[in-house]
């Protein structure tokens, strides 16, 4: 949204690519908005962001599915909580909410626990792919003149008369305005700039991802009644056809601790079994965890710092942050444009064209694609039917450092049953040929994850 203005914009990123951190590891849910406390910023941006997703996904070419959600009640004594959730959703302005009885729920989702007594149906709920959405937004910004600086963690911010001096990586940047959207580290950036004091506690959520063979066991996103720690363990299809279960909710201290644990995964299976008793454990293909930026104040902080002019925050953006992100970005961009008196960009490009997916093509489209570009005729990832042409395009379009996981997030190469066992080194070879990077410099996910070492190193 800020790229719609004539402002000069630089995105400073600590990691080697976009869509790192919490963006790549969350539930991928576009929430309807029934859960957030009425009157909070979480409630406001949830409902506003939800309404923006269909058009934004179409405009920028990332996946979105309006599959709806069910909040399940398994005990009659909990029915008042379900009805309270319905009333909260009405207060928040959520459309189409209805309470369904047992037979209606089971007709809609036959694989869930038959002990269900009722459910809140939220038809405006949806699912997306968070990293593809972020990549699409970043590419759109780049094609409209926004610059990116990677592997540049911010280490110092100095307030000057007409703005700020920011030290990031090995560079110094002078700017009139800062937007603090640093996720787990937003409290540290705020403190560095002399702004508001907030405390962000990482809240770990562990997930289990199942093969596409299990993807049809649920069509809607299935929640249990929420608790003070969050929306609980969900069972949901993904936009790519898998089945996802999780997350746990554990407050931790280490902002870099994304390790999965046996206890966490046991908790996911145990809790998810209440929703879906016959969990297809043989179809489990991977586990992962993500960290939510939980602000101890309990709500988002969006807007200009009350003490430091020119410092804007998107702080404490935990769930429903993915849903609210478009609305938050739009509002901040409009505020900054107004405050700086910047005109609109006259040649703004509205649409972004995604990589054409071979797996989604008809036979006729595949034949045409291969005739125009023979690389579309060579399969690199058998599990997800990803071609060499798609891998090459992903490499060309990467804004930061090219990595195996960066290609994976742009193409799904390595996201199937074998989790890259067949295609990982083939992707590395294509990166080597396309970029000239030595094989020992190519990493899976940045520093510390090299795939190859020099031969003489092995002999030491």
Label each PLM-derived region with a short phrase.
Residues 120-177, 185:
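Helical element adjacent to the flavin cofactor pocket in flavoenzyme catalytic cores
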Residues 157-162, 166-246, 250-261, 270, ...:
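Flavin-dependent oxidoreductases
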